[in-house]
A protein has these predicted regions:
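Short, solvent-exposed loop/turn and secondary-structure capping segments
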Residues: 1, 31, 41-45, 86-90, ...
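Metal-dependent phosphoester-hydrolase catalytic domains
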Residues: 5-13, 65-75, 81-173
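Soluble or luminal CAZymes and related metallo-dependent hydrolases
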Residues: 11, 52-60, 163
Length: 173
């Protein structure tokens, strides 16, 4: 495992972790991220703007994929802290979304459907995503938000206090 972008705290306050794994004899690179939180939903041309910082992180991540991990099995996961369903002008993911022959957010259908399935129910919003490269498009079995609070006697309140304010999003290949 390696940390990337360790020298760019503005775009990556928490450097992404790249894990190289072998899955069914294939090399797979899983990149876990936690992008900058908060903001007002509008990308402003200001290096301190939260959406601008996330947009830069997305651009650098895509460049990293296209220069360092060309034609590799890629899975980008984590807390992206932004909505996939934003309009194009304020959608930090547009570089990936518009490049749909090479990349796919496999949880887009969750983001565009009922809030009961979203990953961040206390807001409510869907901020945790999974992006895959085209090498894995045909390997997706299912994607879902995992409602772990169902396994706690205190339901969401207990899960939120003990584990996280986010639900995990799972991908089966």
């Amino acid at each position: 495992s390696d940390l990337i972008f360790t020298d760019d705290w503005r775009s990556f306050p928490r450097p992404p972790l790249v894990a190289h794994i072998i899955w069914e004899g294939e090399d797979v690179y899983v990149i876990n991220n936690h992008y900058k939180c908060c903001g007002n939903g509008i990308i402003e041309d200001d290096e301190d703007d939260e959406e601008y910082r996330r947009l830069q992180a997305i651009k650098y991540t895509k460049d990293y994929f296209e220069n360092s991990l060309v034609n590799k099995n890629l899975v980008l996961v984590g807390d992206f802290n932004d909505e996939l369903s934003d309009e194009k002008t304020n959608n930090i993911y547009w570089d990936f979304i518009s490049d749909n022959s090479n990349y796919r957010f496999v949880d887009l259908f969750i983001a565009c459907n009922q809030s009961t399935d979203w990953s961040y129910p206390s807001w409510p919003s869907h901020l945790d995503h999974i992006l895959i490269s085209n090498e894995l498009f045909n390997n997706v079995n299912f994607v879902q938000t995992i409602k772990l609070e169902q396994f706690f006697s205190g339901s969401w309140h207990e899960y939120n206090n003990i584990i996280s304010d986010h639900r995990p999003v799972g991908l089966s290949l």
